[in-house]
Amino acid sequence: MPLSYQHFRKLLLLDDEAGPLEEELPRLADEGLNHRVAEDLNLQLPNVSIPWTHKVGNFTGLYSSTLPIFNPNWQTPSFPDIHLHQDIINKCEQFVGPLTVNERRRLKLVMPARFYPTSTKYLPLEKGIKPYYPQDVVNHYFQTRHYLHTLWEAGILYKRETTRSASFCGSPYSWEQELQHGAESFNQQSTRIFSRAPVGPCIQSKHQQSRLGLQPQQGQLAKGQRGRSGSVRSRAHSATRRSVGVEPSGSGHNNNSASESASCLHQSAVRQEAYSHFSTSERHSSSGHALELHDISPSSARSQSKGSVFSCWWLQFRNSIPCSGHCLSHLVNLLEDWGPCTEHGKHHIRIPRTPARVTGGVFLVDKNPHNTAESRLVVDFSQFSRGSTRVPWPKFAVPNLQSLTNLLSSNLSWLSLDVSAAFYHLPLHPAAMPHLLVGSSGLSRYVARLSSNSRIHDHQHGTMQNLHNYCTRNLFVSLMLLYKTFGRKLHLYSHPIVLGFRKIPMGVGLSPFLLAQFTSAICSVVRRAFPHCLAFSYMDDVVLGAKSVQHLESLYTAVTNFLLSLGIHLNPTKTKRWGYSLNFMGYVIGSWGTLPQEHIVQKIKHCFRKIPVNRPIDWKVCQRIVGLLGFAAPFTQCGYPALMPLYACIQAKQAFTFSPIYKAFLSKQYATLYPVARQRAGLCQVFADATPTGWGLVIGQQRMRGTFVAPLPIHTAELLAACFARSRSGANIIGTDNSVVLSRKYTSFPWLLGCAANWILRGTSFVYVPSALNPADDPSRGRLGLSRPLCRLPFQPTTGRTSLYAVSPSVPSHLPDRVHFASPLHVAWRPP
């Protein structure tokens, strides 16, 4: 007789009219019964030939290619001038007194952050901006390039000037070593050579400083020597390699001594200009990733300079005859002054050797599902998470649901702060720059790569006939529209650029770890400064709690001022006041406990409406369904064990078929959600123990025992004993000597037993008692005669071993010789 839904609920002891627990519960551990129920519910069917369902409501497989939508009107978000103060430790100590070891260690981690992968793969510049939107290639190129420029202007990126130097905007840190020229710092005045050199001798004067000291110049053009900034095989007269905005200075010859002075800077800057107009082949040479310029003899260059100036690709159109109605020369002739070919930051620093390559691609997407007007930059540094260049990221503990409830479930009044661009607060050491490079190859090479026109790939980038190969109707129309948005910046953005991260990027596994360490240390400082209040953070989500609303407002003012004094930028418009029910990490947390937020509850209802019955569903779609249901599982009667059939199918990579009964069972489970309550401290008065053949309980002074019909595995027997203890005594603190029961993970038990036990033991706290001290040990072995005294076992609710919440005691007067601690860095979070 097939199993009905009512019979199934009765079987799981979810209804009140069940028989005595000692008889009913052990039956659920029977393997035969579990198999029969699974067959009735269609849970273990072999693979069938019916085609799989690949979409359930909004859920598609994890690897489905949902095409992103390009928005030509995306606004690039503005970034404030974020500069986290370097003496952050001193400022915190002024605020709260001496820091604890933990706080100091965490703050030192991010001042500056360091990133040293074992090996790095370099990609050509053409892969800098991903062709993510094939229909809007040019538009996406300029939008992305503008976003990168905005980040550079906000001091979040370095711009690679030469192989060994970079420039940036904003305030410098002490570890960013400014380039020195003689005794004089490389300041704003000396950078003018890049944009427009002053009349008179070049910065490389009569004497050049080499590593050996001051040496006279070795003639007009020192050919054979190699500069440390990379090997360039055939060098040309600097006056002939004139790029727009770089006027040749009087004596400006390139003298290549082995120095890191301005000659290298000037020559490399001009070389970088040249590399967008000359035919360049990029090779990985033994001396570094250098650019090789081919077939440019001084004589050929000189003859060119007399005719058409060797200028940038963009400005060459000015002197050319229009090839058609949509020739780019029409656009270029709209403006007389297109501005400089490149821009340079206020500060120039020394960096490790950095090739003109990228290590990750970038593209734009909507800022979030609710804000499609603004764009967000996605940086793909996935090479550091895959294959041979994989980096083992540090793991850090995240509070599980019970810890979070123990900590935050209270009658406090709450508000949450929004840290604007939180990741971009944390500075990176310049030594990390060669590993975190983004950029673009310039418009001409980008369009050429995506164009099917093979003529563009020949080696004649400098000639006029080749120039007009780019003139297509689509490109012309796109650029004319973009001209309205970007104006003369079109010229700047059409040049190649290489940028390295100065603040931690979002696409690297190190960043979430560092952000969590940083915000947890700051919150720890705030908690110690205001011991009667609560400050807590998860990543960039910071919450403050206080006894009354007035108290909370004054706390908010004090904390905001403190954070601003450290250089942390808050977004006051996004500060949310929650009253007594805090919305945090997808939960609503109040004095009554924790529940999922309403939008998640609605998502679950929508999901159940869409789940088809008796049709195989692709296991990747099941992953999505389980992800959603798993989040709310702790709030249901049967918890995670109810989802075990789905987990099993995903593990076997097989399709899953929902039977009407299993679907009805699950939807009923999720129709009523029970809050997860805060654990309370107390004394343990109830103990349970079991052997494979029998169980024993001690409830206060009362002792009882029983036997199983057939021998059971020890973990199953211990779980049954704990269930009996809970149902007989009603106590919510139970002592047990079994670590599996203690962990409260019932997914490895027989399925029906796991579901029933989860409901019986919901809200129970367990205390570990060693077997030798367990008073229930004798009754479980059938000995009721000997009465062992009850051990005094206090239960203390835990807030978890998390790097996000450390109780901060007053600083000890002296440090112990050796501190033993299990580092929270190696503890991965698993669902509670």
UniProtKB/Swiss-Prot annotation:
Pfam families xref list:
DNA_pol_viral_C (PF00336), DNA_pol_viral_N (PF00242), RVT_1 (PF00078)
Residues at the site labelled Priming of reverse-transcription by covalently linking the first nucleotide of the (-)DNA: Y63
Listed under catalytic activity are:
DNA(n) + a 2'-deoxyribonucleoside 5'-triphosphate = DNA(n+1) + diphosphate; Endonucleolytic cleavage to 5'-phosphomonoester
Q: What is its EC number?
A: 2.7.7.7, 2.7.7.49, 3.1.26.4
Q: Which Gene3D superfamilies match?
A: 3.30.70.270
Q: Which family does it belong to?
A: Belongs to the hepadnaviridae P protein family.
Q: What is the protein's name according to its record?
A: Protein P
Q: From what organism does this protein derive? A: Gorilla hepatitis B virus (isolate Cameroon/gor97)
